[in-house]
Regions:
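C-terminal reverse transcriptase regions that engage the nucleic-acid substrate
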Residues: 1-41, 173, 181-183
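RNase H-like nuclease module associated with reverse transcription
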Residues: 16, 52, 84-202
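RNase H-like nuclease fold core
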Residues: 55-94
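Conserved active-site beta-strand-loop modules that form the wall/rim of enzyme catalytic pockets
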Residues: 6, 40-42, 52-54, 69-71, ...
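Structured nucleic-acid-interacting core domains from mobile-element enzymes and related host factors
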Residues: 33-59, 120-122
Length: 202
């Protein structure tokens, strides 16, 4: 998949590949029409040596399995992303966001090791940006884990990475959360604005 702007749509459609209905076919046609109308778009790399490995992660809380999305940048260039359903049931939006941060952290670990193998020097914590202050607090506060025993392993995994300064979880206002387009069907205005903020397409 080479278009981050259709990642959420493609992920949702893939869930119904074994038993698609008329509504899914109609949605797939809309995606194809969008791709036709934006065929000239491409990923643009504008390296910024000041920026290291950073990621943006968001989750949309659902009554059962939430959807998480993440974007990963190196030197300010988008090179990897995901949009997928969580495998664990979370009991609040904060837990869903925290679990999304854990998924992003797993990707970051793999990416860091890959970059090191390629000869890059990674000597600073990789930043994971999340739009939930509660989720950020859970990554630093041991007391918070008493309320999250059902996702204890994920909590311990992420907190260990934070303690070892492998990753750093930071809050980012929802209005500028780029990963929002990977977790829900945004309105046209919001979608267009986030794509502009992404500053990756040309």
């Amino acid at each position: 998949m080479t278009r981050v702007d259709i990642a959420y749509s493609a992920s949702q459609l893939a869930r119904f590949m074994t038993n698609p209905g008329p509504s899914h076919f109609k949605a797939a046609i809309r995606v194809l029409v969008y791709l036709r109308d934006t065929a000239a778009r491409a990923l643009v790399m504008r390296p910024d040596p000041v920026r290291g490995l950073e990621s943006f992660v968001d989750s949309s809380w659902a009554t059962k399995f939430s959807c998480s999305g993440g974007m990963f940048f190196y030197y300010g260039c988008l090179f990897h992303w995901f949009s997928k359903m969580q495998r664990s049931v979370t009991l609040s939006s904060a837990e869903a966001e925290f679990f999304g941060a854990m998924l992003a952290a797993k990707e970051v670990i793999f990416i860091r090791e890959l970059l090191i193998d390629l000869g890059f020097i990674i000597d600073a914590a990789s930043v994971i940006k999340c739009d939930s202050k509660s989720a950020v607090g859970m990554a630093f506060d041991p007391v918070a884990f008493k309320k999250t025993k059902h996702i204890l392993r994920a909590a311990e995994f992420l907190r260990d990475l934070v303690a070892r300064e492998v990753v750093s979880v930071e809050h980012l206002p929802g209005a500028v959360m780029l990963a929002d387009i990977l977790t829900k069907a945004a309105s046209r205005a919001v979608f267009v604005e986030l794509i502009k903020q992404l500053d990756t397409f040309a």
